[in-house]
Amino acid sequence: MLTKSFEPRPEPSNTGPAPSSGKPPFMQRQLPQVSVILLSAVLMHPVNAIGAEPDWSLGVYGGKYHDTDPGSFLQGRANFLNQHMLALTASKTLWRSETLPLSLEIDGMIGQQFGLASLTEIAVAPVLRWSGFPWNNTLQTDLRVGPLGVSYTSTVSPLERGPDGNGSRVLNFLMLELAFSLPQMKSREVFVRLHHRCTIYDLLNNYGANGEDFLAVGYRLRF
């Protein structure tokens, strides 16, 4: 009788683990640690969102091609052609100064060009953001500058071919941007961007053609 009373007890220990989770022993051992990490991230996120500047952004912009480099455009020398771009852009803040209104971001874009030629462009560049303008209490204004990046197009644009017909799909990506927002809604920006591909003074090629340039207007949500 004593033996019979103890016989059923081994059964729950043999069958219990299978219906309870079905996970391998390794995952069962690691699950508590993973849960703690995820919980910590969730608890920390609201603090970062409230107590710090936004570090991420998503945006969209559209632009039209002009036939001069950014310097000539700023001097008023530009002719616009029937070549357009629609693009998605995203950025992440990598560093923020503790004493100056200055931060470093990594900015990426993917866009589709259409009009005289149809092609896709992907580009990425480190970008400096300056937010120290004296009128920012009235209109938040940020200057973003990215002189050195990488731009790749799915095909060589006819607007970038030299006299011999050659061109490069990979060129330097340069961007110059002014972003505007209301002081109480700095997470929503309207921006004007000069989007430029170049050879860095014939360093990347010497085909004798200027890279594409677009004057673009866009909207960005920072979070």
Residue ranges: model-predicted function:
Residues L58-K64, P70-Q75, S103-F114, V192-H196:
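Transmembrane beta-strand segments that form the barrel wall of outer-membrane beta-barrel proteins
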Residues T89-D107:
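A glycine-rich, hydrophobic loop/mini-helix early in the fold
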Residues F80-H84, E98-L100, S118-I122:
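Generic alpha-helical scaffold signal
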Residues K64-P70, Q75-A87, S103, S157-F180:
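Contiguous hydrophobic segments
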Residues L94-R96, M109-L215, R220-F223:
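Outer-membrane beta-barrel transmembrane domain signature
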Residues V47-T93, R220-L221:
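Short glycine/proline- and aromatic-enriched beta-strand/turn motifs that initiate or cap beta-hairpins
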